[in-house]
Amino acid sequence: MTLEHFPPPARIAALLGILLLSACGTEQIDPPFYRAYRDQYAITAEELKTLQFYISGDVLAHAVDASGGVTPEQVVIVKKRTPGLVREVGPNWLRVAFTEGGEGVLFRLRSDRPTAVYALATRTADGSIALVSDLRDPVLIQGERRYRLIQGADVYLTVSAKDLGHVIESRPHVTGLEGKK
């Protein structure tokens, strides 16, 4: 069936629908950064530092001080898709900076599964790294500063699909053999 079989308004709607669908199909979606990517493609610490990461959701935090109150200067807002770069790499964690010269924020794997993502984390009193979403009181410790999370304790890292694709393409690929014709 061709477009000529449709009346003019329906023909225009069909063409617009086709154009919209084709436009949607070309947009790259930046995926969560899964453990499987790092493991399966043997992504090195140096390569991790070249990837563009983003935060998956909005974060709202208040700096905690002895006064107990919150001033506007103590409110920290990090918007969804704020870009960041890896500064340090551990076996199951990454430290990602979202500001120039910033010390970075910890993200730790949620589990040992291949589908685990790197979620917001913090150092605990005993020096271990805990997921902020697992804490009874969601407080993020950054050096000497402490921040109570009002929103976003469950955020995780997403990665630029384009950058990740470049790393994957840099791996050896088998070209295959063709028979003589």
Model-identified regions with their sequence ranges:
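C-terminal motif of bacterial Sec signal peptides marking the signal peptidase cleavage site
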Residues: 20-23
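N-terminal post-signal-peptidase region of extra-cytosolic proteins
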Residues: 39, 64-82
